Structures are given as structure tokens and as C-alpha cells.
């Protein structure tokens, strides 16, 4: 009898542990969302409010995060781009929690204030190689980009919306993390790169002051132009689930759409609600 009671206690404890583990959240995907939202206060605020913990926040990029979700390795993926047709066919659901711009950055001493889409396309396909050809100084253009084979949303969206699907030019400097693209640009007066506007906040102040975002087609990336889509490289920030959100993933998504969650989004990005 005593052994039976002990066994029942052990079983109850085991079920409690398993239940607690089942409540944990795991995330993989966009570094824009991971760094600029989850690690910028959202995960901690959600833990405080719900008791549900994030045991993993991995940031391999939107494409790889979605694949991890499809493989059953995580409960929640992040995508800083719209879902592709083939992803929707796999019954994935994306919930928009905010908006972002892929901003074009140059060194602060660069006199160029705006580029057209065609000029930007020419730079990143290697057709335009000198700043004087786009209204700047007589100096070679030194573009950098994220790693082109990374399947990251910024690389794919920029290629689709700016390059019209054309291949990137040969010889682009490829950098693993978008934050490090800005760090590199701060040290290269003739440089240019395209990075999430929201991630600028993660760059040290002394380096951040050495770069500037420029207009695209004379439209600056700001709350109004990004939310309306007037800025060419605007994009939604999605939390992605396999089917309709449920369980801890649903709780977190619901939290991100509350006033508290949207205030966290607004620190670095454009919230869904004004």
C-alpha cells in the first residue's frame, strides 16, 4: 500500500513536470523579431504576466525558422516578410504584430539623401559603381549585405522588391548579422547597406551616430509611410504557427496585440495599432 502511494506521488510529480514543460515556448526565425521584440522586453514581460517561459529564442532567419516550425522543432516561428504561397499551402498562419522597413543606410558624411529604386538596383546588381553617378562624391561604392545564401527575409525581399528578382552583383561584402552590417558601414565612408530600421537601436551609440537612413524614391521610412506601404520596402512582422494559434503560442500572440505588447513593438518598430 505504501509503495502504491509512493508510486502515485511520483507519477503526480512527473505529470506536473511534464505539464510545466509543455507550457514552455520555443521560437525560431527572424532576427529582426528575435532581437528587436522578444529580447527587447516582450519575452520577459510575457513570463511575468503568464508564467510561461521561453526556453529557446533562436534567430537563424525567417526561412530557416519556418522550416524548424514545419519540422516540429519549435512552437512558434518569426517571419519579417509575408508568408510565401507554398508556406500558406502547408497551413501555416501568420499573425501580424507590427511593421518594419528595410532601410537604406549610408555613412553620415555621404551627401546623398535619396536614391530611386533604379539607382539602388544598379548599385546592388553591380551596374552602378561610383557615387558620382547617383549625385554623390567621386568615390567607389562599397555595398555590404547579409549572407546571400542565408534565406533571411531582408535578402529575399530586397531582391524581390528592389532588384526585381535579378541576382545580386558579384563581389558584395557579405556579413552574417545585420547589426554588424551597420557596424561595418560606420567605418566605411563610401559604404551602403540595407538593414531593418528597428535594429539600429541595437547598435552602440558612437557607431549609430556615424550612419544615416536615406529616402527611397523621395519617401523616408517612418511610421506613416511604413504602415501605409508607401515606403517601397515595408514589411509585416509575423508570428507564425502551424494552423490557428493554440496553447502558449496563442497566449503569447494575444499578449503581443494588447496595449502592453504593442508598446514593446513601438520601441523599435511600427505597431499594428496607432
Give each language-model segment a name:
Residues 7-17:
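Bacterial N-terminal signal peptides
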Amino acid at each position: 500500500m505504501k509503495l502504491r502511494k509512493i508510486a502515485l506521488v511520483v507519477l503526480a510529480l512527473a505529470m506536473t513536470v511534464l505539464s510545466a514543460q509543455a507550457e514552455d515556448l520555443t521560437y525560431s526565425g527572424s532576427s529582426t523579431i528575435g532581437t528587436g521584440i522578444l529580447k527587447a522586453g516582450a519575452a520577459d514581460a510575457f513570463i511575468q504576466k503568464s508564467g510561461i517561459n521561453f526556453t529557446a529564442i533562436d534567430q537563424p532567419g525567417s526561412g530557416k525558422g519556418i522550416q524548424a516550425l514545419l519540422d516540429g522543432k519549435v512552437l512558434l516561428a518569426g517571419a519579417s516578410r509575408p508568408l510565401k504561397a507554398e508556406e500558406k499551402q502547408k497551413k501555416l498562419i501568420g499573425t501580424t504584430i507590427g511593421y518594419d522597413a528595410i532601410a537604406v543606410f549610408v555613412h553620415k558624411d555621404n551627401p546623398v539623401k535619396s536614391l530611386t529604386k533604379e539607382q539602388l538596383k544598379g548599385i546592388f546588381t553591380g551596374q552602378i559603381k561610383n557615387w558620382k553617378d547617383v549625385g554623390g562624391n567621386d568615390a567607389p561604392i562599397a555595398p555590404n549585405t547579409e549572407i546571400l545564401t542565408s534565406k533571411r527575409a531582408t535578402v529575399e525581399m530586397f531582391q524581390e522588391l528592389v532588384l526585381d528578382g535579378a541576382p545580386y552583383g558579384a563581389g558584395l561584402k557579405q556579413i552574417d548579422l545585420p547589426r554588424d552590417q551597420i557596424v561595418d558601414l560606420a567605418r566605411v565612408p563610401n559604404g551602403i547597406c540595407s538593414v531593418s530600421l528597428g535594429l539600429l537601436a541595437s547598435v552602440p551609440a558612437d557607431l549609430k551616430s556615424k550612419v544615416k537612413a536615406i529616402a527611397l524614391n523621395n519617401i523616408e521610412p517612418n511610421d506613416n509611410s511604413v504602415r501605409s506601404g508607401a515606403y517601397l520596402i515595408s514589411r509585416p512582422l509575423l508570428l507564425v504557427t502551424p494552423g490557428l494559434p493554440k496553447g502558449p503560442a496563442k497566449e503569447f500572440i494575444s499578449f503581443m496585440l494588447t496595449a502592453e505588447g504593442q508598446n514593446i513593438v513601438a520601441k523599435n518598430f511600427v505597431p499594428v495599432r496607432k
